[in-house]
Design a protein with these regions (language model features):
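Hydrophobic helical membrane-anchoring modules
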Residues: 2-17, 187-260
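Short beta-strand/loop segment that forms part of the nucleotide-sugar
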Residues: 47-57
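Acceptor/aglycone-binding surface of glycosyltransferases and processive sugar-polymer synthases
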Residues: 73, 77-96, 101-103, 113-190, ...
Length: 260
């Protein structure tokens, strides 16, 4: 992994709030400029906005597109490491560059960047340390009926496992305070979205959700290309995350069937 500083803007204020918006990327050359152009340049309560790209071993021109656009930082993997590892590498990079708030969004432009202000407002007000953007799943045209049901079911399972009320657990459109980001520790290789909610819920990190909008689909989802593969991997992720905080309960539950 290589961390590349493209441009570091200096703020002359003694105290200021820095927001870094990060985007995990894998072969996103066709959509990256669209997603980057949509990002805010200024936000109320924020003195400095910077942009970080995680190039997860892309085989296209993603890296060149990020450089030409002028992002501040690039975390560059020579080989594909997967979404979870890319997310954590981005978080580490944002923390190293002094981010007070970190927003994670997707390079396929599925999330409406105009709603980033909604994500950071609860953090700025001191009401939460993690804010998850809740998509209008039932109104999202490019979601199939099966995908909508699985999204709702998966979110319900995560709510039970995490003891939280987050309505859209798979959403990757999120904001983290510096304090929350420093406590994140993703151990699975598949996705960070479910595990981080379970972790935050069990560690009692203040977390909330806000409604956000979505854009039209620019490319098919790479995580959801196999329905049952998605379900299997998601359930394994949730169980592993839950076992980290409730090992005795999980062990007891798994031992009941053989005993009976």
């Amino acid at each position: 992994m290589k961390f590349i500083t493209m441009r570091n803007k200096k703020n002359t204020m003694d105290k200021y709030m820095k927001l870094i918006i990060q985007m995990p990327c894998y072969n996103e050359a066709e959509t990256l400029n669209i997603a980057l152009d949509a990002l805010p340049r200024t936000l109320e309560g924020i003195d400095c906005i910077e942009y970080l790209i995680i190039n997860d071993g892309s085989r296209d021109d993603t890296l060149q597109a990020a450089r030409q656009w002028g992002v501040n930082y690039i975390v560059n993997f020579k080989q594909n490491k997967g979404l979870a590892k890319g997310f954590m590498a981005g978080i580490d990079g944002c923390l190293c560059q002094g981010a007070d708030i970190i927003v994670n969004t997707d390079a396929d432009n599925q999330y409406c960047a105009e709603d980033i202000h909604k994500l950071i407002e609860p953090i700025l007000r001191g009401e939460a340390d993690i804010v998850v953007g809740a998509r209008p799943i039932d109104k999202t045209a490019h979601f199939s009926p099966v995908k909508k049901k699985l999204q709702h079911f998966g979110s319900w399972v995560v709510r039970k496992a995490s003891n939280t009320q987050i309505p859209d657990a798979p959403s990757g459109f999120r904001a983290y305070s510096r304090e929350a980001a420093m406590r994140m520790n993703v151990v699975n290789d598949y996705t960070y979205t479910l595990e981080t909610i379970v972790q935050a819920g069990r560690e009692k990190i203040p977390m909330t959700s806000v409604p956000v909008r979505t854009n039209g689909e620019l490319r098919p989802s790479r995580l959801f290309n196999s329905i049952w593969g998605y379900v299997k991997k998601s359930m394994i992720t949730i169980i592993r995350a839950y076992m980290m905080y409730k090992p005795l309960k999980c062990f007891t539950f798994l031992c009941i069937p053989p005993i009976l």
